[in-house]
């Protein structure tokens, strides 16, 4: 779904549009972006008027959410921490509530403080003008 969206020209036509792919896994999302870039090159899309690669469109306008696993956060090195939003997943049964803070601390144990702040709240504050 993400690859198809990135190849659809929607982001080219609406460069101020911001898109959040919620309920997604960062690992799965990274694959979709890599696939979109591969497909773009294989199909010769740059010669058809595409001005940016799908991964560049994603970096400019899109976000993924993450919420539970440390493995996904390793993918931030590929995606860039500026495009990741943390979700508590509340009120779903898979939410770490009422131990949300402890869960976040465990999830972000290997993440540098600046990136942790960015993912946990700064990206959302910027995106939603809070």
Predicted regions and their residues:
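Histidine/acidic residue-rich metal-binding segments in metalloenzymes
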Residues: 1-57, 71-82
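Generic secondary-structure boundary/loop-capping signal
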Residues: 2, 87-89
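Mid-to-C-terminal alpha-helical segments outside catalytic/metal-binding sites
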Residues: 8-9, 17, 27-28, 51, ...
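Surface-exposed cleft-lining segments at the edges of enzyme active sites
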Residues: 58-62
């Amino acid at each position: 779904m993400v690859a198809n969206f990135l190849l659809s020209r929607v982001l080219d036509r609406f460069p101020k549009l911001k898109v959040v792919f919620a309920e997604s896994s960062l690992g799965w999302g990274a694959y979709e972006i890599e696939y979109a870039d591969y497909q773009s090159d294989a199909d010769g899309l740059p010669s058809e008027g595409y001005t940016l690669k799908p991964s560049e469109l994603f970096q400019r306008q899109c976000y993924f959410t993450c919420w539970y696993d440390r493995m996904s956060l390793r993918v931030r090195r590929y995606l860039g921490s500026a495009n990741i939003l943390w979700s508590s997943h509340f009120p779903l049964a898979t939410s770490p509530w009422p131990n949300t803070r402890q869960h976040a601390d465990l999830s972000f144990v290997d993440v540098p403080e600046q990136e942790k702040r960015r993912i946990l709240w700064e990206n959302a504050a910027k995106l939603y003008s809070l």
